[in-house]
C-alpha cells in the first residue's frame, strides 16, 4: 500500500498546483490580447478629430489635419527642405514643391483654425509686409494670429519678420507682381510679369519671385496697392501662372473684388479691399461691410493693401468685436475652394515626386 502524504505536504502540493494554474491562465490571456497599444507620438497629445471639409486633391490628409486643426494662434510650421527644389537660374535659392507623400505647402504652412466652429467665417489678408520693418513688425505683433500676412518679394531682409510671423501663428502668403491697370504708369517693380513679355522671360521672373522666401502657403496677385488686373485679364498667361502655382502645391488669392474663383488652382477672390481710401472712417466702414457680407453669405475675405498704422489699429480694434457679432476670424486658407475643373480629381504634379 503506497504511503499517504501528510496534511502539510498535501497542502503544499495543492498550493503550487494553484499557482502554476494561475500562471498558465495569465499567459494564455496575454497571448490572446496581444501587445499593448503604442503610446502617442507626442506625449500628452490628444487624437485630432477629422477635418470638417475634405482636403484638396493631391494633399496629404495628415498634413492637412495638422495644419488646419492645430487651432488659432499655434505657430506655423518651419520651412521644410523636403518641400523645396533648387531654383535653376538662381544658385542657392529654392522653389516650393509638393513633397514626399503628397504633402503640399498650402496644407503644411496653413494657419490654424477650429474646424468645430460653425459660425460664419471671415478672413483678412494684409499686404506689403517686409517693405517697412517698423510697420511690418507692428502688424505681426498687434494683429490677431488669424490675419494672413502677404510678404513683398522686394523685402530687403524678410527672414526675421518671417520667423516672428510664424511664431505668432500668422499664415504667410507671397505677393506676386503682376501687370496692373495703367502700366507702366503703375509699376509693380522690375520683376513684374507682363502681358507683352516673352513666355521665357515671365518664367524667369516668376522663378525669381517664388524663390525670395520659403514656408508660404499660397500667393496673392496684389502688391503695394496694385492688383494685376491686366495680367489676369489675359487668359493664356493667367491660366499658365495658375497651373504652375498649383503644381507647386500653393493656393492663389485673386485680389480683384468680384472676380470669379481661380479656374486652375485652389483659391478664392477677394470680396472687398478695406483700405481704399486709407482713412480711419473709410477703413472702419469697409470692415463693417465685410462683416455684414460674412453674416449674409456665410464667409467673406478682405484685403488691406499696406500695413499703415491707421489700418493696423482699425483692424485690431474691429477684430476684437467679431466674436460678439457671431463671427469667426480665420486664415485665408480656411476659405479657399477647389477649382471646378479639378474638384475630386488627382492633381497633376510636376514639381515634386
Model-predicted regions and their roles:
Residues 2-30:
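Membrane interfacial helix-start segments of signal peptides and signal-anchor transmembrane helices
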Residues 200-281, 306-316, 322:
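Catalytic domains of cell-wall/extracellular-matrix polysaccharide-remodeling enzymes
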Residues 154-158, 195-205:
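Glycine-rich anion/phosphate-binding loops
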Residues 103-187:
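Active-site beta->alpha N-cap acidic-glycine motif
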Residues 129-131, 154-157, 178-182, 224-229, ...:
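Solvent-exposed loop/turn segments at secondary-structure junctions
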Residues 29-100, 107:
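Juxtamembrane proline-rich low-complexity "stalk" or linker regions positioned immediately after a signal peptide
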Residues 122-126, 145-151, 172-176, 219-221, ...:
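Hydrophobic faces of well-ordered beta-strands that scaffold small-molecule active sites
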Residues 264, 272-353:
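Extracytoplasmic/luminal low-complexity segments enriched in Pro/Gly and acidic/polar residues
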Amino acid at each position: 500500500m503506497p504511503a499517504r502524504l501528510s496534511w502539510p505536504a498535501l497542502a503544499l502540493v495543492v498550493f503550487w498546483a494553484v499557482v502554476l494554474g494561475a500562471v498558465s491562465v495569465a499567459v494564455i490571456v496575454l497571448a490572446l490580447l496581444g501587445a499593448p497599444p503604442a503610446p502617442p507620438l507626442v506625449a500628452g497629445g490628444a487624437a485630432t478629430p477629422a477635418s470638417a471639409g475634405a482636403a484638396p486633391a493631391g494633399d496629404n490628409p495628415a498634413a492637412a489635419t495638422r495644419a488646419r486643426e492645430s487651432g488659432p494662434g499655434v505657430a506655423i510650421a518651419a520651412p521644410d527642405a523636403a518641400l523645396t527644389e533648387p531654383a535653376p537660374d538662381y544658385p542657392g535659392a529654392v522653389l516650393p514643391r509638393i513633397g514626399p507623400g503628397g504633402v503640399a505647402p498650402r496644407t503644411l504652412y496653413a494657419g490654424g483654425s477650429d474646424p468645430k466652429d460653425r459660425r460664419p467665417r471671415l478672413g483678412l489678408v494684409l499686404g506689403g509686409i517686409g517693405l517697412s520693418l517698423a510697420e511690418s513688425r507692428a502688424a505681426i505683433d498687434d494683429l490677431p494670429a488669424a490675419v494672413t500676412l502677404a510678404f513683398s518679394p522686394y523685402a530687403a531682409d524678410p527672414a526675421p519678420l518671417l520667423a516672428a510671423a510664424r511664431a505668432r501663428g500668422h499664415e504667410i502668403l507671397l505677393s506676386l507682381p503682376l501687370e496692373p491697370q495703367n502700366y507702366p504708369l503703375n509699376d509693380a517693380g522690375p520683376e513684374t510679369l507682363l502681358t507683352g513679355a516673352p513666355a521665357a522671360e515671365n518664367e524667369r521672373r516668376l522663378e525669381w519671385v517664388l524663390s525670395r522666401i520659403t514656408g508660404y502657403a499660397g500667393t496673392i496677385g496684389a502688391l503695394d496697392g496694385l492688383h494685376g488686373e491686366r495680367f489676369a485679364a489675359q487668359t493664356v498667361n493667367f491660366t499658365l501662372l495658375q497651373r504652375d502655382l498649383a503644381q507647386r502645391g500653393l493656393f492663389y488669392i485673386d485680389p480683384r473684388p468680384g472676380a470669379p474663383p481661380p479656374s486652375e488652382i485652389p483659391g478664392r477672390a477677394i470680396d472687398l479691399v478695406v483700405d481704399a481710401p486709407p482713412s480711419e472712417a473709410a477703413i472702419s466702414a469697409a470692415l463693417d461691410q465685410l462683416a455684414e457680407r460674412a453674416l449674409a453669405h456665410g464667409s467673406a475675405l478682405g484685403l488691406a493693401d499696406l500695413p499703415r498704422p491707421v489700418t493696423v489699429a482699425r483692424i485690431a480694434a474691429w477684430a476684437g468685436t467679431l466674436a460678439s457679432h457671431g463671427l469667426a476670424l480665420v486664415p485665408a486658407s480656411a476659405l479657399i475652394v477647389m477649382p471646378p475643373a479639378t474638384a475630386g480629381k488627382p492633381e497633376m504634379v510636376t514639381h515634386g515626386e
